[in-house]
Design a protein with these regions (language model features):
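A short, surface-exposed helix-loop junction/capping segment
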Residues: 16-20, 107-113, 213-215
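Dinucleotide-binding Rossmann-like beta1-alpha1 core, especially the glycine-rich loop
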Residues: 24, 28-104
Length: 390
């Protein structure tokens, strides 16, 4: 992604990409946000091309299951008509409408970017190679940086082999306690689902991401409340109706939620998982990669300093963190120690502060429409008048 974008926007650049033949791709299937469309469109890749070549599907949103307790289901969509919210809210409160009626007035396919994608993570690099004609591609595993380059992009993941400043902002104390995931691909037993499904479970949640041939699943959990073996047992039981795709086996992913305070230090820039990771919820990881690349190119072209890049990235990481935490903290679930952990904070006020702040004033990862989705999911509109006057 970085090589293709830099080629496109800094045509005078000379790029060498060194790819290890022994380090596999982490993804089990990727769910994206609508902003990814702009990234690929700028490269000249239309929907039909990359959806077909990446085994992809159009994604219309995210369905939350059991976050509100029981079998409650609610679909977050990307369509947004700002003028429809107040009208819908009046009817919702007067006539006790179902939450799903929000789609009738609040969303518009002419609004906030419309749709996103599901795609096979293993196929994305193959497609992007076609759009990096000037990039020298070397297959090798290196232990030190080659000399003679002006700028190095460290994409070595959690190992962070080459970054100069390892000052890490740990978000665990902020409330990001999910730190492991069992992931596996399964054969589809049914028609592919055009929403990412996020199912709240006892000690975390499971994502289900359908592409045209398979379903990528992962049980994201907090190890302080559930052992790795227990989580594997839960994961296998929950997905017992599905057959592994091409003999796939469960894989364990582990991380510490957080980000580098200074991802650009000297002439080395941390990208992707090297820069940071919070968790898979809300398909945020791929967007953070995308934004770090586009922000880097803008910083270079405007001749800004690395400190300005680092400041913007830190702001986005914290904004990302705020939104994800509200999904946990506003949940009324208290059936396990995991969910009771989040009951100690009252986030009603901060929900509405964020809604107002992002209401068509910021171009951000989660605009006001997404905060409104959270409010509808947890029936926070019944409390709106208490908090929106502050």
């Amino acid at each position: 992604m970085a090589a293709a974008h830099i080629e496109r926007h800094i045509p005078e650049s000379t790029i060498t990409l060194i790819e290890s033949p022994t380090i596999p791709i982490i993804g089990v299937g990727e769910s994206s946000l609508p902003q990814l469309r702009n990234f690929f469109n700028e490269l000249g890749i239309d929907d039909d091309t990359w959806v077909s070549e990446c085994n992809g599907l159009i994604k219309n949103g995210n369905e939350k299951v059991s976050w509100n307790g029981g079998d409650d289901r609610f679909k977050f969509t990307f369509w947004y008509d700002a003028n429809g919210l107040d009208d819908w809210l009046d009817d919702y409160q007067k006539y006790n409408l179902p939450k799903e009626s929000l789609n009738d007035k609040f969303y518009s396919d002419k609004g906030w970017q419309g749709y996103a994608y599901h795609l096979d993570a293993e196929l994305i690099p193959t497609l992007l190679k076609k759009y990096t004609e000037r990039t020298t591609h070397i297959i090798d595993t290196i232990e030190e940086l080659p000399k003679g380059y002006d700028l190095y992009l460290d994409c070595t993941g959690f190992k962070r082999k080459f970054v100069r400043d390892r000052n890490f902002i740990d978000l665990t104390s902020r409330g990001h306690i999910v730190n492991k995931a069992w992931v596996q691909s399964f054969k589809l037993n049914e028609k592919p689902y055009n929403y990412t499904e996020s199912v709240a479970l006892d000690y975390g949640w499971q994502f289900n991401i359908d592409t045209r041939e398979k379903r990528g699943c992962g049980y994201v959990f907090a190890s302080q409340f559930c052992t790795t073996d227990q989580a594997l047992k839960y994961f296998q039981e929950y997905n017992s109706d599905y057959e592994p795709y091409q003999g796939s086996e469960p894989r364990l992913l582990e991380w510490t939620s957080g980000f580098l305070d200074n991802p650009w230090q000297g002439n080395i820039v941390a990208l992707g998982l090297t820069s940071g990771f919070i968790e898979p919820l809300e398909s945020n990881a791929l967007y953070m990669i995308q934004y770090s690349i586009t922000n880097l190119v803008k910083t270079i072209k405007r001749n800004y300093n690395p400190q300005s890049y680092n400041k913007v990235m830190k702001k986005l990481w914290l904004h990302n963190s705020d939104f994800l935490l509200h999904l946990y903290k506003l949940s009324p679930r208290n059936d396990t120690d995991f969910w009771r952990y989040y009951q100690k904070d009252n986030t009603d006020l901060t929900l509405w502060q964020n809604y107002i702040k992002h209401n068509n004033k910021w171009i951000s990862l989660y605009p006001s429409s997404m905060w409104a989705n959270v409010a509808v999911l947890y029936d926070e509109f019944s409390k709106k008048s208490q908090y929106t006057t502050v």
